[in-house]
């Protein structure tokens, strides 16, 4: 009889800035919890061989992480997911096929760890991706699209990312999309000899807040256009120079859009916020940075407006990360080791319950025979306690070597066969229902950095 493996089969499907254009990433981008839940539900409904699933959508990547049922065909899962995305996003399967990156098993785990550790980011070492992955996992977990398998994977990924940051210093070198955009803006400011260090920022999400902080560090005055005044008040409390920041409702955009040389836009809107119909000719040149995906700024038709997208910043990013190569090499060593340690950890999780079950089976068998002996008066009742101790010690001695051997072999590839054989031999194979009760043992600390 073929024994089923108890290790999870991991699968990742990814589109990134390395393989897909900004225009196509815009179509895939998910900008609301409702859209995300609908996509996850569609996957759950139409892909029965996918046990658990989560989606990561950022300005530079769209990725699906899944665990598959035993025996699931990865090519079939890839085809099914591409078909769902094509229908959901009104794209062609052939276009998606050209850009997709697929990883399974160990390579899938390595990929997730690399992404979480910011080694696959446009800006290597930026920490924003870890928070984005935590939010993506948190949503999928709370909406019951992922459970034990992805919880274990993401738990270890966050640990790996922290280790990479702590041991390599790769995140301490101050380069991010927001910092590169502000650095380029400062360079423009100096070349253009702009008198007033003022900037207009549309949005108050994570990216926009980072831009604002970088601008303030460069002594800019910032006007923020947003929708949530209460969020602005909370944000201002974090700033060292709150007096240099103002706030207006984004509905007043028309009143300000033609007044600033420097503009940064980073919102989650699926549509253009800045449109050509709002624009007027000015006597000064304007430099705009659209850091959103999908883009928030319609391509200007007026002269003297220079627009930078996320992808336009990539060459500038590469200029700033050259000194990270040594840290990156060390980081990949950590990720490779973490991938091996993850599978050792997973295998040990399968062995520990087996050892516990073997000891419990021995205890129950001994107790059953002791009660028979007492009932038939083979031994006096007053000896019951002493006999229990003797039996307990005897079975501990008997199981000592098998216990050590199981723990030792837990880190070997053949452990699945060994564990499966013992469970089958002693009739200890239980349904996976019990695993749900132990979920909190592995639940990710997605609120921690």
UniProtKB/Swiss-Prot annotation:
Question: Where does the signal peptide begin and end?
Answer: none
Stored InterPro entries:
4pyrrol_synth_GluRdtase, 4pyrrol_synth_GluRdtase_dimer, 4pyrrol_synth_GluRdtase_N, GluRdtase_CS, GluRdtase_dimer_dom_sf, GluRdtase_N_sf, NAD(P)-bd_dom_sf, Shikm_DH/Glu-tRNA_Rdtase
According to UniProt, residues marked as the site described as Important for activity are 111
Q: Which UniProt keywords apply?
A: NADP, Oxidoreductase, Porphyrin biosynthesis
Q: Where along this sequence does the record place binding of NADP(+)?
A: 203-208
**In its keyword annotation, does this UniProt entry include Transferase?**
no
What does this gene product do? Catalyzes the NADPH-dependent reduction of glutamyl-tRNA(Glu) to glutamate 1-semialdehyde (GSA).
Annotated domain remarks: Possesses an unusual extended V-shaped dimeric structure with each monomer consisting of three distinct domains arranged along a curved 'spinal' alpha-helix. The N-terminal catalytic domain specifically recognizes the glutamate moiety of the substrate. The second domain is the NADPH-binding domain, and the third C-terminal domain is responsible for dimerization.
- So what family is this one in? Belongs to the glutamyl-tRNA reductase family.
What is the protein name stated in its UniProt record? Glutamyl-tRNA reductase
Organism lineage string: Bacteria, Pseudomonadati, Campylobacterota, Epsilonproteobacteria, Campylobacterales
């Amino acid at each position: 009889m073929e024994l089923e493996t108890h290790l999870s089969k991991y699968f990742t499907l990814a589109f990134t800035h390395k393989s897909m254009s900004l225009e196509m990433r815009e179509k895939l981008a998910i900008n609301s919890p409702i859209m995300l839940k609908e996509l996850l539900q569609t996957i759950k409904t139409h892909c029965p061989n996918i046990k658990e699933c989560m989606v990561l959508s950022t300005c530079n990547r769209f990725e699906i992480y899944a665990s598959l049922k035993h025996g699931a065909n990865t090519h079939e899962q890839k085809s099914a997911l591409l078909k769902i995305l094509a229908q959901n996003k009104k794209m062609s399967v052939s276009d998606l096929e050209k850009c997709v990156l697929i990883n399974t098993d160990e390579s899938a785990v390595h990929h997730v760890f690399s992404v979480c550790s910011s080694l696959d980011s446009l800006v290597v070492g930026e920490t924003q991706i870890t928070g984005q992955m935590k939010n993506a996992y948190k949503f999928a977990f709370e909406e019951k699209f992922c459970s034990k398998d992805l919880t274990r994977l993401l738990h270890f990924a966050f640990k790996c990312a922290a280790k990479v940051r702590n041991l390599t210093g790769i995140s301490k070198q101050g380069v991010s999309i927001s910092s590169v955009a502000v650095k380029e803006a400062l360079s423009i400011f100096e070349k253009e000899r702009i008198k007033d260090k003022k900037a207009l920022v549309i949005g108050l999400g994570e990216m926009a807040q980072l831009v604002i902080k970088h601008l303030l560090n460069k002594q800019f005055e910032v006007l923020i256009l947003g929708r949530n005044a209460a969020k602005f008040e909370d944000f201002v409390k974090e700033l060292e120079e709150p007096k240099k920041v103002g706030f207006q409702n984004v509905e007043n955009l028309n009143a300000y859009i033609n007044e600033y040389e420097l503009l940064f836009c980073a919102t989650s809107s699926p549509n253009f916020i800045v449109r050509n119909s709002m624009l007027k000719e000015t006597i000064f040149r304007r430099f705009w940075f659209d850091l959103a995906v999908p883009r928030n700024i319609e391509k200007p038709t007026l002269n003297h407006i220079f627009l930078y997208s996320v992808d336009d910043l990539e060459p500038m990013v590469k200029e700033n990360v050259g000194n990270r190569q040594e840290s990156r090499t060390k980081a990949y060593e950590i990720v490779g080791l973490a991938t091996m340690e993850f599978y050792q950890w997973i295998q040990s999780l399968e062995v520990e319950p087996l050892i516990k079950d073997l000891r419990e089976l021995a205890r129950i068998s001994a107790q059953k025979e002791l009660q028979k002996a007492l009932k038939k008066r083979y031994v006096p009742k007053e000896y019951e306690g002493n006999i229990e101790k003797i039996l307990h010690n005897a079975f501990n001695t008997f199981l000592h070597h098998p216990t050590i051997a199981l723990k030792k072999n837990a880190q070997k590839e053949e452990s699945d066969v060994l564990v499966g054989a013992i469970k089958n031999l002693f009739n200890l194979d239980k349904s996976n229902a019990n695993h749900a009760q132990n979920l909190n043992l592995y639940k990710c600390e997605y609120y921690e950095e």
